[in-house]
A protein has these predicted regions:
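Conserved C-terminal helix/tail region of periplasmic/extracytoplasmic solute-binding proteins
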Residues: 282-317
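Pocket-lining segment of extracytoplasmic ligand-binding domains
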Residues: 82, 155-249
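Structural motif detector for alpha-helix initiation sites
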Residues: 118-119, 206, 303
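Stable alpha-helical elements in mature extracytoplasmic
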Residues: 34, 43, 62-65, 80-83, ...
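Short, glycine-/small- and polar/acidic-enriched structural segments
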Residues: 16-170, 189-190
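Short, low-complexity disordered leader/linker segments with a strong preference
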Residues: 1-21, 316-317
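Secondary-structure end/capping motifs
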Residues: 211-296
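Sec/Tat-exported extracytoplasmic proteins
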Residues: 42-45, 50-51, 73, 78-81, ...
Length: 317
């Protein structure tokens, strides 16, 4: 299914037996509504309308999507603008081509009665996160936290339910549902409200972009069409996602969808004109500067090599 063309210059992308061009999308987690637009484009035939046969490969906590794309195991992947910039700084030849979320749904979840009322209050507490998370370093620096501890995330609410002082990293569209279903009263604090707000993006390899810009354009166009459709007509797509990931209930998927829609994570609500799929050079530069300040990017480079505005709705800005 995957040709070696993506690793070398000057060769054509091969068509499958059905006459469609096969490509793979590596997601960042197991099938869920946060991927709804991609499944919409696949199920409703929008990829096929563009001549593409798209395989959606589920991710998980230990999948390195940047590496998958760099070595040609996938042509496209989901990620975030901060991770793309860090990967490019580390020599990974990847390029972001469109945004799938204008706002980042990462948050901290706390019990309703927690004494932690703001990010400044995290001092003296432990926080369960994916160890090494850059946003956590940003919080420590911005709020001058001296005594906050990282503990490994378990990707479950079990520890949260047992410990009234527990604080954990979450997607605000996911874990609060499970905690409330189990009887907890919870609060959340969005990381994006601190000023650290990466896009969620689609990225590809620099080689694939250079060799197959027409395929990239088709994939972006069909994916954004799927996202527009999913935000209006989610039910049958959620039913299909539920078959792929039976751990998700109808109620949980509805909770996730409503969060994505009502909090404008996908389409954005920026008065300056943020819209589905778009990103701006100014915001990429701002994120790059934050990473430089945190010293997670050690050797400066032009952040413009990490993204392209070529495929964005109305050209981006």
């Amino acid at each position: 299914m995957l040709g070696i063309c993506i690793m070398t210059g000057g060769c054509r992308r091969q068509h499958g037996a059905n006459g469609l061009t096969p490509v793979t999308l590596q997601t960042d987690w197991y099938p869920q509504p946060e991927h709804g637009g991609f499944y919409d484009a696949q199920i409703r035939g929008y990829y096929k309308d563009e001549g593409l046969d798209v395989t959606i490969r589920p991710g998980g906590p230990y999948v390195n999507a940047e590496q998958q794309v760099s070595v040609g195991e996938a042509q496209f992947a989901m990620g975030s603008s901060d991770r793309v910039l860090q990967a490019v700084g580390n020599g990974e030849p990847i390029v972001a081509v469109a945004a799938t979320m204008q706002r980042d749904p990462q948050a901290l979840m706390l019990h309703q009665d927690s004494p932690v009322k703001s990010f400044q209050d995290l001092d003296g507490h432990a926080v369960a996160i994916k160890l090494g998370a850059t946003w956590f370093s940003y919080l420590v620096q911005r709020y001058h936290l001296k005594n906050v501890r990282e503990i490994p995330a378990t990707y479950s609410v079990a520890n949260f339910m047992q410990d009234p002082g527990y604080i954990q990293q979450i997607f605000v569209t996911s874990e609060p549902f499970f905690a409330r279903q189990a009887g907890a009263r919870v609060r959340t604090m969005l990381i994006s409200e601190t000023g650290y707000n990466p896009y969620r993006v689609i990225f590809t390899s620099r080689a694939f972009l250079q060799q197959h810009p027409e395929i990239v354009a088709k994939f972006v166009r069909a994916s954004l069409r799927g996202w527009r459709d999913y935000l209006i007509h989610p039910d049958d797509i959620n039913a299909a996602i539920g078959k792929l990931n039976p751990a998700l209930s109808v109620a949980q998927m509805q909770f996730s969808y409503q969060g994505l829609r009502d909090q404008h994570f996908i389409a954005g609500d920026d008065p300056s004109g943020a819209e589905l799929g778009q990103f701006t050079a100014a915001r990429w530069t701002s994120m790059y500067q934050q990473l430089l300040d945190l010293k997670v990017i050690e050797k400066p480079f032009d952040p413009a090599i990490a993204y392209t505005l070529q495929f964005l709705p109305k050209g981006g800005s």
